[in-house]
């Protein structure tokens, strides 16, 4: 009798527990009405407003975000996922970056967690004001859009070199075919020399009530020491701006100028020139021939000369004689000229090589880089090139050289352009007499006419060339006048 009673009580107790569980389930209004795709633990509103994420979306930092990406490792053999692990995991902050705190709303938190903001742009175009957000300095670094190249730093460019007015006048005089006018003081040296190098004075006057001595200093370390013919010093006498300072000695007598070398160590000063100073009505140049001294000092890196004026055994203020150097322009500074003639023919390519590098590869890179810079202006100016007449005989054709279009106007002063000409055309049998063919060219042309496949034709090449004078700035920033041979084609022939 007890066993049936115990079974009855047990069944009644189980029925009571089932009834209580059913009441609890019926009391949850949202149970069984979840929106498909919503995750456990979220309300209906959250499930509707939360956008689904694509699977296996790659994010910067090497992490993979997506539905089931985080929970895939937690799935069992049955494929079920616990609801607790569906909740977003809190990722540790990356090194170097500030920790972002969650906002007060779960909806805001979920939206922010899935918004990918490109670098340099904040959501809505505004900076975040939340606590723990990135500092303003970090945000400013992000303002540059991806792929935008950094602003290149402007390369250092040395100040432009202003040519001395005397060198410009010298170029105009010596480049003239008739050699009319100009300075006669350099006619002898210029007639023998093909190179004239100029050096600007780097000395400064002493500050004081009077200047008794002046030192003229020139850097000649980059001077070519071979084939030198002469040297001279040119100093400008300029009428003083201060009318209180007379341009002639107060006694009315003529002062004496003395030019000597600067004493150094055990080397005493050597007297170079003594001359009288006449009255100064205007500006003029005092020219001193110092070749005898310079022959002994040409291997030095620096040349120093000293100037002083005397009257009756007393030193005279040089500023009163028109030698004041304060606030003088480049074309008014003292100039040291060296005349030379090289025994071998100088190639213009050597000067280009000195400015661009040491090996031929660097030179060609320099040439092509300058060509690329000027390619657009050349294309716009020249237009289409006329087609060649392949049947024309060998003759001289036009070739206009423009150094500015080549990008060399930063170191070539004059001329900026000239007519070089070139040779073009066929060398066919019989060769004309004006082509001045050699005996070898005649035989080669005859063989080519008989059997073109066995013997190539002769070439149309320059047979006579002439020089031009170029005024340029060398690699040491000195203004140089130089005559380059074989720069202009005068006649063409078959060789």
UniProtKB/Swiss-Prot annotation:
Report one GO cellular component.
extracellular space
Gene Ontology biological process? BMP signaling pathway; cell surface receptor protein serine/threonine kinase signaling pathway; chondroblast differentiation; chondrocyte differentiation; embryonic limb morphogenesis; forelimb morphogenesis; hindlimb morphogenesis; mesenchymal cell apoptotic process
Compositional bias annotation for Low complexity? 124-137
Q: Where in the cell is it found?
A: Secreted; Cell membrane
What Gene3D superfamilies would the database entry show? Answer: 2.60.120.970, Cystine-knot cytokines
Asked if Cell membrane is a keyword of the record, the answer is yes
Q: Major place of localization?
A: secreted
What segments bear the compositional bias annotation Basic and acidic residues? 142-156
Q: Where is this region: Disordered?
A: 30-162
One of the record's GO molecular function terms: BMP binding
Positions bearing carbohydrate: 183
User: The organism sits in which domain of life?
Assistant: Eukaryota
Q: Which UniProt keywords apply?
A: Cell membrane, Chondrogenesis, Cleavage on pair of basic residues, Cytokine, Disulfide bond, Glycoprotein, Growth factor, Membrane, Secreted, Signal
The propeptide sits at 28-375
Q: Name the protein family.
A: Belongs to the TGF-beta family.
- Which disease shows up in the entry for this protein? Defects in Gdf5 are the cause of brachypodism (bp) which alters the length and numbers of bones in the limbs but spares the axial skeleton.
Q: How does it assemble?
A: Homodimer; disulfide-linked. Interacts with serine proteases, HTRA1 and HTRA3. Following LPS binding, may form a complex with CXCR4, HSP90AA1 and HSPA8. Interacts with high affinity with NOG; inhibits chondrogenesis. Interacts with high affinity with BMPR1B and lower affinity with BMPR1A; positively regulates chondrocyte differentiation and induces SMAD-dependent signaling. Interacts with FBN1 (via N-terminal domain) and FBN2. Interacts with TGFBR3.
* Reported function: Growth factor involved in bone and cartilage formation. During cartilage development regulates differentiation of chondrogenic tissue through two pathways. Firstly, positively regulates differentiation of chondrogenic tissue through its binding of high affinity with BMPR1B and of less affinity with BMPR1A, leading to induction of SMAD1-SMAD5-SMAD8 complex phosphorylation and then SMAD protein signaling transduction. Secondly, negatively regulates chondrogenic differentiation through its interaction with NOG. Required to prevent excessive muscle loss upon denervation.
The protein in question is named Growth/differentiation factor 5
Q: Which organism is it from?
A: Mus musculus
Q: Which gene encodes it?
A: Gdf5
């Amino acid at each position: 009798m007890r066993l049936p009673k115990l079974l009855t009580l047990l069944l009644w107790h189980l029925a009571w527990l089932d009834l209580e569980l059913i009441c609890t389930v019926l009391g949850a209004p949202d149970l069984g009405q979840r929106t498909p795709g919503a995750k456990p633990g979220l309300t209906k509103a959250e499930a509707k407003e939360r956008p689904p994420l694509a699977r296996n979306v790659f994010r910067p930092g090497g992490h993979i975000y997506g539905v089931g990406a985080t929970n895939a490792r937690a799935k069992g053999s049955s494929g079920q996922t616990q609801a607790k692990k569906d909740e977003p995991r809190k990722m540790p902050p990356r090194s170097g970056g500030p920790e972002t705190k969650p906002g007060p709303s779960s909806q805001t938190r979920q939206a922010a967690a899935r918004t990918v903001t490109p670098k340099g742009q904040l959501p809505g175009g505004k900076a975040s004001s939340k606590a723990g957000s990135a500092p303003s300095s970090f945000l400013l670094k992000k303002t540059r859009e991806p792929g935008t190249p950094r602003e290149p730093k402007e390369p250092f460019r040395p100040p432009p070199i202003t040519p001395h007015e005397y060198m410009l006048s010298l170029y105009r005089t010596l480049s003239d075919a008739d050699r009319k006018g100009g300075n006669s003081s350099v006619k002898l040296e210029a007639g023998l020399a093909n190179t004239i190098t100029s050096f600007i004075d780097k000395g400064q006057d002493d500050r004081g009530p009077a200047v008794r001595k002046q030192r003229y200093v020139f850097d000649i370390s980059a001077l070519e020491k071979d084939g030198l013919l002469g040297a001279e010093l040119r100093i400008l006498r300029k009428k003083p701006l201060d009318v209180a300072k007379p341009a002639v000695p107060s006694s009315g007598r003529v002062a004496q100028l003395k030019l000597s070398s600067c004493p150094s160590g055990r080397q005493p000063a050597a007297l170079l020139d003594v001359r009288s100073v006449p009255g100064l009505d205007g500006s003029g140049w005092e020219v001193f021939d110092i070749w005898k001294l310079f022959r002994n000092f040409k291997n030095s890196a620096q040349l120093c000369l000293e100037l002083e004026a005397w009257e009756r055994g007393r030193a005279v203020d040089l500023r009163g004689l028109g030698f004041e150097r304060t606030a003088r322009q480049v074309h008014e500074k003292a100039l040291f000229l060296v005349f030379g003639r090289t025994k071998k023919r100088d190639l213009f390519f050597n000067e280009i090589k000195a400015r661009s590098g040491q090996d031929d590869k660097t030179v060609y890179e320099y040439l092509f880089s300058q060509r690329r810079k000027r390619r657009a202006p050349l294309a716009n100016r020249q237009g289409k090139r006329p087609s060649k007449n392949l049947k024309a005989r060998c003759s001289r054709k036009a070739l206009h050289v423009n150094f500015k279009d080549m990008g060399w106007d930063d170191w070539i002063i004059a001329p900026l352009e000239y007519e070089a000409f070139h040779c073009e055309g066929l060398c066919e049998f019989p060769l004309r007499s004006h082509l001045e063919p050699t005996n070898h060219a005649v035989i080669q042309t005859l063989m080519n006419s008989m059997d073109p496949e066995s013997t190539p034709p002769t070439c149309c090449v320059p047979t006579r060339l002439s020089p031009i004078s170029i005024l340029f700035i060398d690699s040491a920033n000195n203004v140089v006048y130089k005559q380059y041979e074989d720069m202009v084609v005068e006649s063409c022939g078959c060789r």
